[in-house]
UniProtKB/Swiss-Prot annotation:
The chain crosses the membrane at residues 3-23, 333-353, 360-380, 387-407, 431-451, 463-483, 528-548, 853-873, 875-895, 897-917, 953-973, 984-1004. It is found in: Cell inner membrane. GO terms for molecular function: xenobiotic transmembrane transporter activity. It comes from Escherichia coli O1:K1 / APEC. Keywords: Cell inner membrane, Cell membrane, Membrane, Transmembrane, Transmembrane helix, Transport. Disulfide bonds: none annotated. Its main location: membrane. It is a multi-pass membrane protein. This is Multidrug resistance protein MdtC. GO terms for cellular component: plasma membrane.
C-alpha cells in the first residue's frame, strides 16, 4: 500500500522517473547498431594451400590429410571439411559459438606450422588462412570494367590496390578477386620448332630462369665515394624476353622468339568474369563472422571515393551488388508495423473506455515502456534487427495489458463514486498482485529460451530478453506512472461523457449479458466442456505431428546466388560460353536488376553467379517464384545446369553448395562412397519433395593416362623425372620465374602454345633430350589412353565425403524433404560403410526438431512453478494453464490455413501464447478467490461473478494483444516472410483461446475446487473413524 502511495502522491518524482527511462531509451536507440538478425554467425576459418599442376587425389593425400590431422586437434572445432581440386586445397574449420575467432586463428596458424614439415617441398608458398566463411554470400560485390585496360591490368589494380585497402576496413573478413589473374609474361612454345633446333623444354625453362635473377651485387668504395652496383639482371616484359638466347645450334644462336610466342598476358588464362554482358573483374567482399553487415557496408561505401581516386579514370568502379538496401527496407517495414500496432492498441483502449483522458494514460505508458527497452538492448550489446523489433511490436499488446488492468479497475471505482486519488490507490492495491503475476509468469516463459544453446538459442536470446525487459519496464510503469496519472487526471464520468460511443458501449453490454447467460448453461454442463477440453489436447498433438515444419522461414532478400555445374570434361572455352548463355537468360528476366558471374580456376566445369533483383515494390513475384520461372528456362541449356537459391540472412556450415540444404555421405571406403553416391543422388532426384538435387562428387572427369615403358626409358637414357618435367613444362602453365615490381610480383608462365594442343595428337609432338643429347619423342617410351579421374576429392573430418545439395519445391517443407530422404535411404538398403547425415541448416533443423517439444514443456513447467509460488497452491496454476490447449489449436490451425510451415518463428509465437492466454485465467482466478475469501460466495458463484466482472478487461487485453499482432499478419514488403508466421500464430491462438477459455477456465476452476474438497475430507473422515 505504501509503495503505491509513494508514487501516487508524488507526481513530480513519478513523472521525472518516467522521463529518465525515456531519455535513456532514446540515447540507447541512437547508439544501437542495425542488422538483419541477431549475431548468429559461427566462427569460421578457411585454410588454403596450392601446388600447381597437382591432381585432386595428390592434393588430398599429400596436402589436405597432413593439414587435417594437425588442424583436427584444435579445441572447439565443431566441423572440418575440405575440398581438393586441381592444384589447390581448401579446408573449412567451423568452431563452437563460444570460441573466440582471434584465438582460433592463432591456433590455426600454430597447427599449420606444425604440419609444415609433412607438406610437399614443391609448394610455392605456405598454406594461408582467412577469417571468413566462403559459403556466405558476399555482402557487397564491386566490379571493374574498362574499354582500354586489359583484364590482367584490371585484376592487378583490384588485387594490388583495392583489395588490401578494403581488407583493412573494420568488419571485412575477406576480399576475393575473381574474373582473371595477375599479369604475367606467357611463353607459348612451338614443339616442332624446338625439335628442329634440338632444344628441350627444360633447356628453355633453365635459360629463362637463369636470365631473370634478382640477387644483391654489392658496392664499390674508394677513399671518398661509394657506388652501389646495379645490373640489368632482370627482364620485365615480353619484349625483353623474346631476344633471349636459349641455345646454340651449329654455331647459330637460337632465341626464345624463334621457338615460342612470348606475350604480356596473365598467369591463368582459364578465368573469366562478367557483369551483365561486359567482361569484368569482381571483388567479392565478405564480412567477419562477428561483424555487423550494415556498419561494414557503410564503411566500405564511405571509402569508395578514395578508392576510385587511386585507379585510372579509364577504369569504371561500380557496386554490382549490395545486400544492405533490402535489410534497411525490411527494418523500416518492421518499424512501421510497430507504429501501427501502437496506434491500434491505443484505439482499442479508447473504444472500451470511451474517454479521451483515460486513453492518454496507456498512450503514455506504452511508449515509455517500449522506448526504455532500447537502453537495456544497448547495454546487452544487442542490435536493431527484425527479431528485436518484432519483439517490441508484440510487446505493444503486453505492455498495454498491465496499464489496462490497473486503469480499468481504477475507472470502475471512479464510476462507483470514489474520489480519484482514493480510487487510484484502492484500484492499484486490488490488482497489483494480478499485474505482478501476469508479468512474472510471462517473463518465466522465456527462461527456457535464455538457457537454450546452439544457433536457435543465440537467435532467440535477443527476442526473449528484449520482450522480457519491455514487460519489466511495463510492470514498473503500470504500478507507478499509470496510477499516478489516473489519480490526477481521471474524474467521475459525467452522463454526457457516458453517452459517447453509445453503439459500441451497448454492444459491449449486450455481449457481456449474452456471455453471462451462456456461462450459466456451461456451468450446468461441465462434463461436455471437459470433453471439449480433452479434445483440444488431443487435437494439439495431432496437429503438431502433421503440420509441415522448417527451420526458418524462407526469406526474400532480393539477392539470388547461382552455382553452375557443367559436364566434367568440359573445356574452359565451352564453359565460358555456358556462363554467357546463362547470364543472358537471367538478364532478360524483367525482375532482374543486375547479374554478375565468373568461372575458371582449379575447377573449370563450375562457376558462380550473383543476381540482384529489383526492389519488392517494382516486382510482383517473390524470389522463390522468380526462381521457379527461371528454372524452366535454364533447363533448356544443354551440357550444364544452373542451380539458383535465394540468399538468406542465416546460413550454417562452410560448404560451398549449389542449393540451400545439404545431406552428406561419409565413408572410410572411398570406393564404396563412389559406388553408392550416384545411386542415392539419382533416387533423391526423383522425390517430389526435393528440387535441384546435385552433388559435389565429381569423379568422372576426362583424363589421359600415360603409361611409361621403363625398360625402354632406361635403354634410351631417360628417367621418369625428366618425362614428368616435360609434361609439366608443356601443359601445366608452369611458373618458372618471378618478375619483381614495386607494387607486386608477377610470374613468367611457360606452356606449349594452345594452338598446338587442340587435340590428343599434341602428345606425339612432345620429346625429351636424353643423356646423349638426342631428342626422343614421347611416343617412343610411353603410350596413352583416355580414362576417368576425379575433379575434386572431399573430406569431412578424416573421412571421404560427398555432399548432396537440394532446394525445396514450392509448397514443400524441410520436414517433408528430410522424411523423404530418410525413407529413400531405407529403401535403397545403403550399407553401413556409407553413413548419411544432414548438414548445415538441415542439421540444425533436425537438432531443433528434437528440442522443440522439450522447450515447450519446459516453458509450461516454469510458468507453473512461478504461479505456484505466487498463489501458494499446486492447483490454481493448473487452472490457469488449462487455457493453453485451445491457444495451441488455434495457432496450428491458422498456420495450416495460411499454408505456413511450423518454423522457429512460429515456435516463438507458441511460447508467447503460453504467456498471453493465461492472463485471462489469472484475472478470473484471482477475483474468484477474493470473492470466496471476502464475499462468502460459493465457488460457482465466485467464478461466475469473477468472469462477468473481469469480462471487460479480458476483452480489452485480448483485443489489444490481437491488434498488436495483426499488423504482422497483414504486413507485406521486405521481411514479411519473418513477420507473418509470428502474427499468424498469435492471432490464431488468441481467437481460438478467447472463444474457449471464457468457458473452459471456470469449469476447470470448479473441477479442481471439488477435487480439493474431496481430498480435504478424507483425512477428517480417517480421524473420526
Amino acid at each position: 500500500m505504501k509503495f503505491f502511495a509513494l508514487f501516487i502522491y508524488r507526481p513530480v518524482a513519478t513523472i521525472l522517473l518516467s522521463v529518465a527511462i525515456t531519455l535513456c531509451g532514446i540515447l540507447g536507440f541512437r547508439m544501437l547498431p542495425v542488422a538483419p538478425l541477431p549475431q548468429v554467425d559461427f566462427p569460421v576459418i578457411m585454410v588454403s594451400a596450392s601446388l600447381p599442376g597437382a591432381s585432386p587425389e595428390t592434393m588430398a593425400s599429400s596436402v589436405a590429410t597432413p593439414l587435417e590431422r594437425s588442424l583436427g586437434r584444435i579445441a572447439g572445432v565443431s566441423e572440418m571439411t575440405s575440398s581438393s581440386s586441381l592444384g589447390s586445397t581448401r579446408i573449412i574449420l567451423q568452431f563452437d559459438f563460444d570460441r573466440d575467432i582471434n584465438g582460433a586463428a592463432r591456433d590455426v596458424q600454430a597447427a599449420i606450422n606444425a604440419a609444415q614439415s609433412l607438406l610437399p617441398s614443391g609448394m610455392p608458398s605456405r598454406p594461408t588462412y582467412r577469417k571468413a566463411n566462403p559459403s556466405d554470400a558476399p555482402i557487397m560485390i564491386l566490379t571493374l570494367t574498362s574499354d582500354t585496360y586489359s583484364q590482367g591490368e584490371l585484376y592487378d589494380f583490384a588485387s594490388t590496390q583495392l583489395a588490401p585497402t578494403i581488407s583493412q576496413i573494420d568488419g571485412v573478413g575477406d576480399v576475393d578477386v575473381g574474373g582473371s589473374s595477375l599479369p604475367a609474361v606467357r611463353v607459348g612454345l612451338n614443339p616442332q620448332a624446338l625439335f628442329n633446333q634440338g632444344v628441350s623444354l627444360d633447356d628453355v625453362r633453365t635459360a629463362i630462369s637463369n636470365a631473370n635473377v634478382r640477387k644483391p651485387q654489392g658496392a664499390l668504395e674508394d677513399g671518398t665515394h661509394r657506388w652501389q652496383i646495379q645490373t640489368n639482371d632482370e627482364l620485365k616484359t615480353a619484349a625483353e624476353y623474346q631476344p633471349l638466347i636459349i641455345h646454340y645450334n651449329n654455331g647459330g644462336a637460337v632465341r626464345l622468339g624463334d621457338v615460342a610466342t612470348v606475350t604480356d598476358s596473365v598467369q591463368d588464362v582459364r578465368n573469366a568474369g562478367m557483369t551483365n554482358a561486359k567482361p569484368a573483374i569482381l571483388l567479392m567482399i565478405r564480412k567477419l563472422p562477428e561483424a555487423n553487415i550494415i556498419q561494414t557496408v557503410d564503411s566500405i561505401r564511405a571509402r569508395l571515393p578514395e578508392l576510385q581516386s587511386t585507379i585510372p579514370a579509364a577504369i569504371d568502379l561500380q557496386i554490382a551488388q549490395d545486400r544492405s538496401p533490402t535489410i534497411r527496407a525490411s527494418l523500416e517495414e518492421v518499424e512501421q508495423t510497430l507504429i501501427i500496432s501502437v496506434a491500434l492498441v491505443i484505439l482499442v483502449v479508447f473504444l472500451f473506455l470511451r474517454s479521451g483522458r483515460a486513453t492518454i494514460i496507456p498512450a503514455v505508458a506504452v511508449p515509455v515502456s517500449l522506448i526504455g527497452t532500447f537502453a537495456a538492448m544497448y547495454l546487452c550489446g544487442f542490435s536493431l534487427n527484425n527479431l528485436s523489433l518484432m519483439a517490441l511490436t508484440i510487446a505493444t499488446g503486453f505492455v498495454v495489458d498491465d496499464a489496462i488492468v490497473v486503469l480499468e479497475n481504477i475507472a470502475r471505482h471512479l464510476e462507483a463514486g470514489m474520489k480519484p486519488l482514493q480510487a487510484a490507490l484502492q484500484g492499484t492495491r486490488e490488482v497489483g498482485f494480478t499485474v505482478l503475476s501476469m508479468s512474472l509468469s510471462l517473463v518465466a516463459v522465456f527462461l527456457p529460451l535464455l538457457l537454450m544453446g546452439g544457433l536457435p538459442g543465440r537467435l532467440l536470446r535477443e527476442f526473449a530478453v528484449t520482450l522480457s525487459v519491455a514487460i519489466g519496464i511495463s510492470l514498473l510503469v503500470s504500478l507507478t506512472l499509470t496510477p499516478m496519472m489516473c489519480g490526477w487526471m481521471l474524474k467521475a464520468s459525467k452522463p454526457r461523457e457516458q453517452k459517447r460511443l453509445r453503439g459500441f458501449g451497448r454492444m459491449l453490454v449486450a455481449l457481456q449479458q449474452g456471455y453471462g447467460k451462456s456461462l450459466k448453461w456451461v456451468l450446468n454442463h461441465t462434463r461436455l466442456v471437459g470433453v471439449v477440453l480433452l479434445g483440444t489436447i488431443a487435437l494439439n498433438i495431432w496437429l503438431y505431428i502433421s503440420i509441415p515444419k522448417t527451420f526458418f522461414p524462407e526469406q526474400d532478400t532480393g539477392v539470388l546466388m547461382g552455382g553452375i555445374q557443367a559436364d566434367q570434361s568440359i573445356s574452359f572455352q565451352a564453359m565460358r560460353g555456358k556462363l554467357q548463355d546463362f547470364m543472358k537468360i537471367i538478364r532478360d528476366d524483367p525482375a532482374v536488376d543486375n547479374v554478375t558471374g565468373f568461372t575458371g580456376g582449379s575447377r573449370v566445369n563450375s562457376g558462380m553467379m550473383f543476381i540482384t533483383l529489383k526492389p519488392r515494390g517494382e516486382r510482383s513475384e517473390t524470389a522463390q517464384q522468380i526462381i521457379d520461372r527461371l528454372r524452366k528456362k535454364l533447363a533448356k541449356e544443354p551440357g550444364a545446369n544452373l542451380f539458383l537459391m535465394a540468399v538468406q540472412d542465416i546460413r550454417v556450415g562452410g560448404r560451398q553448395a549449389n542449393a540451400s540444404y545439404q545431406y552428406t555421405l561419409l565413408s572410410d571406403d572411398l570406393a564404396a562412397l563412389r559406388e553408392w553416391e550416384p545411386k542415392i543422388r539419382k533416387k533423391l532426384a526423383t522425390l517430389p519433395e526435393l528440387a535441384d538435387v546435385n552433388s559435389d562428387q565429381e569423379d568422372n572427369g576426362a583424363e589421359m593416362n600415360l603409361i611409361y615403358d621403363r625398360d625402354t626409358m632406361a635403354r634410351l637414357g631417360i628417367d621418369v623425372q625428366a618425362a614428368n618435367s616435360l609434361l609439366n613444362n608443356a601443359f601445366g602453365q608452369r611458373q618458372i620465374s618471378t618478375i619483381y615490381q614495386p607494387m607486386n610480383q608477377y610470374k613468367v608462365v611457360m606452356e606449349v602454345d594452345p594452338r598446338y594442343t587442340q587435340d590428343i595428337s599434341a602428345l606425339e609432338k612432345m620429346f625429351v633430350i636424353n643423356n646423349e643429347g638426342k631428342a626422343i619423342p614421347l611416343s617412343y617410351f610411353a603410350k596413352w589412353q583416355p580414362a576417368n579421374a576425379p575433379l575434386s576429392v572431399n573430406h569431412q573430418g578424416l573421412s571421404a565425403a560427398s555432399t548432396i545439395s537440394f532446394n525445396l519445391p514450392t509448397g514443400k517443407s524441410l520436414s517433408d524433404a528430410s522424411a523423404a530422404i530418410d525413407r529413400a535411404m531405407t529403401q535403397l538398403g545403403v550399407p553401413s560403410t556409407v553413413r548419411g547425415s544432414f548438414a548445415g541448416t538441415a542439421q540444425v533443423f533436425q537438432e531443433t526438431m528434437n528440442s522443440q517439444v522439450i522447450l515447450i514443456i519446459a516453458a509450461i513447467a516454469t510458468v507453473y512453478i512461478v504461479l505456484g509460488i505466487l498463489y501458494e497452491s499446486y492447483v490454481h496454476p493448473l487452472t490457469i494453464l488449462s487455457t493453453l490447449p485451445s491457444a495451441g489449436v488455434g495457432a496450428l490451425l491458422a498456420l495450416q490455413l495460411f499454408n505456413a510451415p511450423f518454423s522457429l518463428i512460429a515456435l516463438i509465437g507458441i511460447m508467447l501464447l503460453i504467456g498471453i492466454v493465461k492472463k485471462n485465467a489469472i484475472m478470473m482466478v484471482y477475483f474468484a478467490l477474493e470473492a470466496q475469501r471476502h464475499g462468502n460466495l460459493t465457488p460457482q458463484e465466485a467464478i461466475f461473478q469473477a468472469c462477468l466482472l473481469r469480462f471487460r478487461p479480458i476483452m480489452m487485453t485480448t483485443l489489444a494483444a490481437l491488434f498488436g499482432a495483426l499488423p504482422l499478419v497483414l504486413s507485406g514488403g521486405d521481411g514479411s516472410e519473418l513477420r507473418q508466421p509470428l502474427g499468424i500464430t498469435i492471432v490464431g491462438g488468441l481467437v481460438m483461446s478467447q472463444l474457449l477459455t471464457l468457458y473452459t477456465t471456470p469449469v476447470v476452476y470448479l473441477f479442481f475446487d471439488r477435487l480439493r474438497l474431496r481430498f480435504s475430507r478424507k483425512p477428517k473422515q480417517a480421524v473420526t473413524e
